[in-house]
Amino acid sequence: MRFTLTKEFIDVIRQKYVEQDTSWFHENVLELHYADIAEILDQLTNDEAKFIYFLVDEDTQADILMELDEDVRDRFLASLTTKEIADQLENLDSDDAADILGELTDEQIHEVISQMEDDEAAEDIVDLLNYDENTAGGLMQKEFIQANMNWTVDRAIVELRRQAEDVEKVYNIYVVDELNKLIGLLSLKRLLFASPKTQISEIFQSKNIISVKTSDPDEEVAKIMEKYDLVAIPVVDFQNKLVGRITLDDVVNLIKEEADKDFQLASGISERIELNASVWRISRARLPWLLIGMVGGIFSAQVISQYENGITLVPSLAFFIPLITATGGNVGVQSSAIVVQSLAKGNDQIGSIMQKLLKEGLVGLMNGALLSVLIYGIAFIFASSTLGFVVSISLFVVVVFAAIIGTLIPLILHKNNIDPALATGPFITTLNDVIGLFIYFTVGMLLYQI
């Protein structure tokens, strides 16, 4: 039965914490899935969360720790001694442990590592900390199953049992040569059905082996795993020696983080912000784009001021300013959002780019024509035929230009290695406001012969 967290249940937990009723927690909380326990701890104070956390067995503690909200986890770890942190890291996969250590100061890292009892685990974590966090090396884990090509099946099974003690999930066996270079894969099924004296070299798969290098960007890793539908991918160094693997759950977390970042950029927030971030940090993240919007507003005001005489002679021109700016901004954001989504999937070839530009241009022409006819009728009924022509022609041109600009800007940013998600936010809206107003008043002045 699926667990649903309620306020009433949290209230009971808090009461039982006050009473220190450990038997109740064992019966009603510790039996839950670790993801549900993590959801509960996210809602509690640090002391309440620690009380429940240390009632759980060590293996489940590791799962809960990685399921906690990032800010809650950081606050929780900050309340632990370096020895307690070291004990927790020994229960985690090396990549997760390295991620947690990476948030600490150099002095804290040294203290935690020095207090870890498992020297091999400590060495693996230190090794991972040497890689850039945005590369395959920073994403990989050191726990994996490997077999030498010269082993027999029965020896491989014995070795794999020993290796599997530290590996949470086994997807494939990586086959290496005497120099530890990756040469192929072996499925568990094929290993188990092979004769005990058969050599691994006779049964492993050596063709079409997909791997990544430690220096490959993490986004490239995600694209490769998506393309080949992989649940895990081996990681090799520049000599093709096997050094780790990346699993699907790591990539899913990466994709989620990138999606969150792009959404915040599109919303005009310049850095990643958590729900419980400080007021100063939230203000700092939002202010740059608000300033850009303000500057854009000043430019728009300047454009309007240049046509002050025309507005004085034809005041009804001012009525449709919001329509022009809002429509241009919406069209630009729609076009840029489609292009950004396409670029995120790796579609950045020249042919594909020209196709996008042509398609968005045609969409702009079609939508512009339909909207122009509609607005002409409305303006004609409530104002005059001349104003109807001004608004409809302007709207048509603005929609087409906005569609093209919304397509081009993400492509230009991507070409210059700038995150194209920037183009889906206030930047594109502000730019289209200025251009749209210029087009609108220029058409108005021409048709009214001012």
Segments and roles (model prediction):
Residues 1-266:
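Hydrophobic packing positions in regular secondary-structure scaffolds
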Residues 155-158, 435-443:
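Extended alpha-helical regions
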Residues 247, 429-432:
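Ser/Thr-centric signal marking residues that sit
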